[in-house]
Swiss-Prot record:
GO CC list: glutamyl-tRNA(Gln) amidotransferase complex
Gene designation: gatA
Disulfide bonds: none
Organism per entry: Ehrlichia canis (strain Jake)
Domain of life: Bacteria
Name of the featured protein: Glutamyl-tRNA(Gln) amidotransferase subunit A
Subunit structure: Heterotrimer of A, B and C subunits.
Keyword set, alphabetical order: ATP-binding, Ligase, Nucleotide-binding, Protein biosynthesis
């Protein structure tokens, strides 16, 4: 029965529909897996809620065979950044460690309304700030993959709990969030599929804010088709979110035709780093392999230039830190969250925030406050926004002559949990994912193979605005040639 855990969402749905097993049986198997997990992927478990949802799903399968939603009865995990009514939501920060929301985030509500079974809340870097899931108040998450030398490696971040849970067969799919690569990079490190839709495609209502102009909900699954099925369940216009876009939500799964003849694929020359950095040679070889797969299917390969790429990372860290310093100003222990009491209110603020925020969060608040301070606003934040526009314009100009862009997702494989990387090296994990985030473009990470250390490597496909269907179709070609690396 445990092989059931390794099925895709589409396969689970088909077998549930044929009544080869019940949603309750499927859910109980996942609950058992979650209870016995050694990855530290789940921070809050909701078995009673899951079984109740599974019973409802079984009733639907028994009495309604038509118009069944593809997520009915499917066990999923939700990143602990999304509010869940009456279920603890912490952003994996001590300052929110006992926060119980009174409402669901819009994407959570859509997911559950589509019949998904919530197994619990997933670990993450505190307030989504990190690339390794080592910045959580609940401790590190472990990647299910083990390096060839036996070393345990990180799952990536900030959606590390989501990627580890899906790759570790603890849930069939998971909600994540992506600010500068926080769905795509952990998906790459764990050998699964991670998709960030166009900014505004999914509502941000009830999603704890990190950087409001960049944050976007995303999905992590084991197959490209599953990403399509999950994505079409969480998209839609939300009148309560001013950044939500009122645009039709297609059935993304119908876009997967496996036909790309004549499709123009852009290869940005600025993303080729292996000539200067020999340690990136392995992903460069995999990139070439992916290019060949697409050529073999009839795609046209075109070299392009994205000249402002080198500015993307510093611009991103100025903007996201500035927005974080503003968003996190609300956490002071007055209305909710953990409070360190003092007779003096200013001292209480200082103690509460100083004790309950982690090191990385404090670092970004300080950087952001500096960038927004009087005398430096124009020199840093305003200039960063101007360069962001240039990065966006590079993409807009490129999409006049190409349809999609193919790049690596991350420069290297997952690194060891015990490896002490300096802050700059850690930030470089997002070098390939940040530009699409700055431009608000949809992007997907799909596995391309294994490194010499037996760890996953992945490629990223970037599409034009609202062309999630197109990037899913292109990713399905790479998936077809690569095969499923997750065993």
């Amino acid at each position: 029965m445990k092989d059931i855990l390794k099925l895709s969402i589409a396969e689970m749905h088909d077998k549930l529909k044929k009544r080869e097993f019940s949603a309750v049986e499927l859910t109980k198997l996942h609950i058992e897996a979650v209870d016995n997990e050694k990855l530290n992927a789940f921070v809050t478990k909701t078995p009673e809620i899951a079984l109740s949802a599974a019973e409802k799903a079984d009733h639907i399968f028994t009495h309604q065979q038509e118009n069944l939603t593809p997520l009915t009865g499917i066990p999923v995990g939700i990143k602990d950044l999304f509010c869940t009514k009456n279920v603890r939501t912490t952003a994996c920060s001590n300052i929110l460690k006992n926060f119980i929301p009174q409402y669901d985030s819009t994407v959570t509500k859509l997911l559950l309304n589509n019949g998904a079974v919530m197994l619990g809340k997933l670990n993450m870097d505190e307030f989504a700030m990190g690339s390794s899931n080592s910045n959580s108040c609940f401790g590190n998450v472990k990647n299910p993959w083990i390096r060839a030398d036996g070393a345990e490696v990180v799952p990536g971040g900030s959606s590390g709990g989501s990627s580890a849970a899906v790759a570790g067969f603890l849930c069939a799919g998971a909600l994540g969030s992506d600010t500068g690569g926080s769905v795509r990079q952990p998906a790459a490190f764990c050998g699964i599929v991670g998709l960030k839709p166009t900014y505004g495609r999914c509502s941000r209502l009830g999603m704890i804010a990190f950087a409001s102009s960049l944050d976007q909900a995303g999905v992590l699954t084991r197959t490209v088709e599953d990403s399509a099925l999950m994505l079409q369940s969480i998209c839609g216009y939300d009148t309560q979110d001013p950044t939500s876009v009122n645009i039709n939500v297609p059935k993304f799964s119908e876009s997967i035709t496996h036909k790309i003849k004549g499709t123009r694929i852009g290869i940005p020359k600025e993303y080729e780093l292996s000539e200067k950095h020999k340690e990136y040679a392995e992903i460069s070889e995999m990139w070439s392999k992916g290019i060949q797969y697409l050529k073999d299917e009839g795609a046209e390969i075109i070299e392009i230039s994205l000249p402002h790429t080198s500015y993307a990372l510093p611009v991103y860290y100025i903007i996201c830190s500035a927005e974080a310093s503003s968003n996190l100003a609300r956490y002071d222990g007055i209305r909710y969250g953990t409070r360190i009491s003092s007779d003096d209110i200013n001292e209480m603020y200082k103690l509460t925030r100083g004790y309950n925020f982690g090191t990385e969060v404090k670092r970004r608040i300080l950087i952001g406050a500096y960038a927004l301070s009087s005398g430096y606003y124009d020199a840093y934040y305003n200039k960063a926004q101007c360069i962001r526009r240039l990065v966006t314009n590079d993409f807009i100009e490129s999409f006049k002559k190409i349809d999609y862009i193919l790049t690596p997702t991350a420069p290297k494989e997952a690194f060891s949990i015990n490896e002490q990387l300096d802050t700059l090296t850690m930030y470089l994990n997002d070098v390939f994912t940040v530009p699409a985030s700055l431009a608000g473009l949809p992007a997907i990470s799909v596995p391309i193979g294994l490194s010499k250390n037996n760890l996953p490597l992945s490629l990223q496909i970037i599409g034009n605005y609202y062309d999630e269907g197109g990037i899913l179709n292109l990713a399905s070609i790479i998936e077809k040639h690569t095969g499923r690396i997750l065993k």
